[in-house]
Amino acid sequence: MKEKTYEGTKKTQNGLKRMVFSALAILLQAVFMVYMFTRLNEYAAAINATTSVLAIMLVLGLYNREQTASMTTPWIILILAFPIMGVSLYLLVGLNGAPHKMRARFEEVDSMLLPCLPENADILSDMYEKVPQATGISTYLAKNAFYPVYQNTDVTYYDQASKGLEAQLSDLSKARKFIFMEYHAIEDKESWHRIQQVLTERVQAGVEVRVFYDDMGSIFFIDRDFSEKMEKLGIKCRVFNPVAPAFNMFLNNRDHRKITVIDGKIAYTGGYNLANEYFNVTHPYGIWKDTGIRLEGAAVKSFTIAFLEMWNASERKVPREVDVSQYLLHYDYEAKQSGYIQPYADSPLDNVQVGEDVYISMANKAQRYCWFITPYLIITDEMSHALTLAAKRGVDVRIITPGIPDKKPIYSVTRSFYNQLVKHGVRIFEWTPGFCHAKMSVADDIMATCGTINLDYRSLYHHFENGCFMADCEVVHEIRDDFIRLFTESAEVTEKYRTGRSARRRLGQSIMRLFAGLL
């Protein structure tokens, strides 16, 4: 036991060293840039003039940018108030700029993979006849995210991540052709060891196994040579966007997706990563609430493509052709459930905020109720307006947030959004047993979504994410029932935030809110 504790501590220390070293190196680059601006006194006039012109150009560019004001306003204020520092920081971290080569790489991969998905226009037409209230969202996803809607798919809902893990292990052990796993965080401890054992057995049985994880998300959980260890076991392994001590504009864009695909027949997604705390093996923040879903049937194709997009785009050189036919084989399956299932993915490399648009659309389409659960509540003006407008229309809008935070500064920002929502009729509940990490929404007993997308700027604008929109199916009622249970375990904070706040608190929260888009 002591040896395991020591190994875990060592991994955390190694990850911390990597993170601190990289952060210091990047900070030094930023400091050096500011230093060069300020110390060249003999060129002060020219530097000030150049900085002023550049600041004006950047502000005008930001003002005319096709982006929410919540994202651009903090930069405009920072650049105008402190031109040298503001311009320097914006050029370093504010351009939302994955390098052109990276964008081109993803566009090239998408051009090869997305056409492999069926259009399913007939299903969309059928959906319009049966559930017109949800059809607009599915049409949006099909035409803008390029992920179609499906039928003939069974969905199983897991109200606890541990239940999802057990089902996942069972399905993994039965894999015959391939296993794809993509996660934001993997922790090299008991929960992962159970998965690794099954994956190793499947490799020995001739199954192709691929594992893909985000370096930043896993940096405190695994050793740097984790991918090499997997390769030695016969598991193909890749790391997304490795943390490096050199400045990289793409560093802020992380892979937050959570996908498992088995033989192209079964897929899993949800809020949980592959680490002990998600399964309540450890309890750093009280009870951990997470959820997941299992798909079996036609809709699995979309998650297969979503995985292959990230896998192939992460190669240094994109192959001229990507043959996915062996992973999209047709097989006879007759679903026991009815309904419409639509997996989708979101990318920060385009100007389409798929995750936010789905949430806003659900609030706009809701007629009776629209409920959300999220670990963080740091939203744009557009999202806030959609929620409050729905409440003003008489829709029962509720949001569940954690009772115990995992990041106290971010929790303070989350709470700073309460007042503007509750005074317009949105009800907010804090889940008192611990930390809720689930990311879901359900509306009117008709539609729901479950996936990886938090109600915060990072998920909605900066990360690669995924979700699954579901309409007119049994799982919607199961998700609704879980929400009802959660409300009974939560403390409503609405009344407290309807009353006035102290001037000090208002000032502090205003500052946090102003720069929330930069978090």
Where are these regions (language model features)?
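Glycine- and other small-residue-rich loops at beta-strand/loop junctions that grip anionic moieties
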Residues: 184, 375-376, 410
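Acidic, glycine-rich loop-and-beta core segments that form the ion-binding/anion-interacting portion
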Residues: 333-338, 346, 353-375, 381-392, ...
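Thr-Gly-centered strand-to-loop micro-motif
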Residues: 373-374, 401, 431, 450-451
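A C-terminal junction/extension of Radical SAM enzymes
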Residues: 421, 428-429
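Catalytic-core elements of nucleic-acid end-processing and repair enzymes
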Residues: 439
